[in-house]
């Protein structure tokens, strides 16, 4: 194993000193209030060893990173029937684009763009009241993170609801094709709330361990999903996890990952570690600017890219 402690601390120190931090998300008012100077990085391996740097224990809004876990949960509920409602291809379009959805008859291109994640949320909601579905998602997050203190930031959820007109348009358009089956307000309510879950880098890195270890969560002591399903979720993270910046992330970092407009990125080094980085300043595609740079530095120093050293 490389000397992860010194690597992580070196990267955190370098990121702290960089002036080019990107811009915080402004279209969700609560996220616009976040201090752009924040930076945290955590790496956790299968033996529970932790390397942490910067603001590793500062909670932030996980936003679209939650889509990895709702996809995992929905696949556990309905299996491959999920793929009748959502595709598995990169979109090449902004995460909240409606143009592609119109061309493809209401079927979202993948589960990590907003339309796809709303459709996945609708599957989880089926047969439940919204509060029950949301409770199931939150309990799953607490379980994989091994931390029952994780909660939803209600201010962020309310802020998203007040300004979520594009998401409402996506959901109503999918409803017209019966891709959404529940009342749109119910589905969007659950969606806004799971995106508003607040977690730290340490908690998110712990939550991603089952994806790094073939579906087995080494700290929980048993399997969360099958090895095949973990491999397939990782594949979708690699190809679709960073909106229309997914190809560039694969080129530069070479790890399965999922970003969120709260500035977090969850990345998976299969068989080696789960990684979470947070820096709220975003690039033009809506991904953490310094987060991507930090992960690129990490894989160069560890040789963890899935494509080789």
Swiss-Prot record:
Classification via InterPro entries: Beta-lactam/transpept-like (IPR012338), Glutaminase (IPR015868)
EC number: 3.5.1.2
Recorded superkingdom: Bacteria
GO MF, one example: glutaminase activity
Bilayer-crossing regions: none
GO biological process assignments: glutamate biosynthetic process; glutamine catabolic process
Record keyword Hydrolase present: yes
Catalysed reactions, semicolon-separated: L-glutamine + H2O = L-glutamate + NH4(+)
Keyword annotations from UniProtKB, A to Z: Hydrolase
HAMAP family, per the entry: Glutaminase
Self-association and partners: Homotetramer.
Protein name: Glutaminase
Naturally occurring in which organism (per UniProt): Methylorubrum extorquens (strain PA1) (Methylobacterium extorquens)
Gene: glsA
